[in-house]
């Protein structure tokens, strides 16, 4: 059964084409412009009406500075929520003083607080020496520790880590994870190094971060990102615990995404992709949004395309495939494949593991065009930033763009998608599954016990005692004894009453987190008459939450 967010009957995707010419009339009916609170009596109209796209994102070029791009999205959200923040202040100040306070705190939130630039030497296996360059950016300490991944890529730059760190701050706020944002990058192509050399680089980078106070369970907690995984996180944890943290009982909480044997958590590897699935699920099951797009709710009979077959792309593909959607194309850096009859994720994964590439997969054809422009219902960019730009946005045929990557859409592309009534599910919400489960892993490390261990047997026994009590009551009622009225649970119920494993708890908590955050975004989009502009709604929610922390904690030495 599918949900209806709005009470009013909403127009179809074809019908929304007329909304552009009727926008002024709709605004007159509502008595306000885009960004102003919606009238409570018109929820459907608030969702359906497409408003003028804000001009606050200043970069109108096709390849904007990544950090400036994120700041522009922040400015757009801040301009919408500023009046509410002023109104909600409970201080004995004049209106002007309150506004100055709000604007001051917003200026505190926006910049990146710390950026560490590192260079260190390593000796390679052939005896040569090489200087490695790396960065760690901490965007905000409004909550500690800071949290953000470490990526290995030759494209790493100061601008990139600053932008990704700021996105992490807002991402954590959107899903109510109490961390500040951070990000790290090491400027290497890991394919050019042996495992021994990568271990040297990772351990030395960890030591450099530790010497500068940029890693620690209560200070800054890295995680996997592009070209890093459990192996690298295990090296980081071991290096920290064996050196700086050798007296700290919580030392292994200095990093998340570790193997289970090193304090990791079940479900972390697939967390980001699973979060992408749940994020899409929450909007594709919302009948009011699907009505605007001219789509039926649910995954059944939907087609999707994945750009990037890494951790996020693979697991997103798995879950969408499992729930009835059909993947018709997959793109990687070395080429793309296409099959209108569908691509099986397990078969493609096995092929890539064996051959090192998706190219040549026997059940699909090579695709020569842009993977982003394939005709489909859902497009999942799960590669790198700034993939959807002003130049290719007009040719995108998908009705839903689900941002599995960080910053895949430039402001100009975002504007074009708004004008075309394409639903963009933003990165700061959609790919927050990774940091959500990282939070669970961090808590597990601090508690020094796995989820469910203390209650697993008790809950299982309690459930069976309950069933036995019901059975005995029925037998007494009908005068039958000795198990003649057996209570037999269904297979699904049997799994549930057997007790929740750590993976069950993690999956359930992640699904709830994504659902609750989606509800908040939908509510904000309606409240401020944002239509399909979910990105601005997500930024508004993030800004409100971060602002509240600064406002109530106070600002030291000002």
Swiss-Prot record:
What's its EC?
A: 1.4.1.3
- Please list the GO terms describing molecular function: glutamate dehydrogenase (NAD+) activity; glutamate dehydrogenase (NADP+) activity
Q: Is the keyword Oxidoreductase in the record?
A: yes
Query: Is Kinase set as a keyword in this record?
Result: no
Location of the transit peptide in the chain: 1-53
Pfam families in the record, alphabetically? ELFV_dehydrog (PF00208), ELFV_dehydrog_N (PF02812)
- Give compartment(s): Mitochondrion matrix
**GO CC entries:** mitochondrial matrix; mitochondrion
Can you state which reaction this protein catalyses?
A: L-glutamate + NAD(+) + H2O = 2-oxoglutarate + NH4(+) + NADH + H(+); L-glutamate + NADP(+) + H2O = 2-oxoglutarate + NH4(+) + NADPH + H(+)
Briefly state the modifications made to the protein after translation: Stoichiometry shows that ADP-ribosylation occurs in one subunit per catalytically active homohexamer.
Alphabetical GO biological process terms = glutamate catabolic process
Could you say which enzyme class this protein belongs to?
oxidoreductase
Active site annotation, chain numbering: 183
**Stretches of the chain forming a coiled coil according to its record:** none
Residues modified as ADP-ribosylcysteine are 172
* Keyword vocabulary terms for this entry: ADP-ribosylation, Mitochondrion, NADP, Oxidoreductase, Transit peptide
Subunit structure, interactors included:
Homohexamer.
Q: What does this protein do?
A: Important for recycling the chief excitatory neurotransmitter, glutamate, during neurotransmission.
Name the record gives this protein: Glutamate dehydrogenase 2, mitochondrial
Q: What is the lineage of its organism?
A: Eukaryota, Metazoa, Chordata, Craniata, Vertebrata
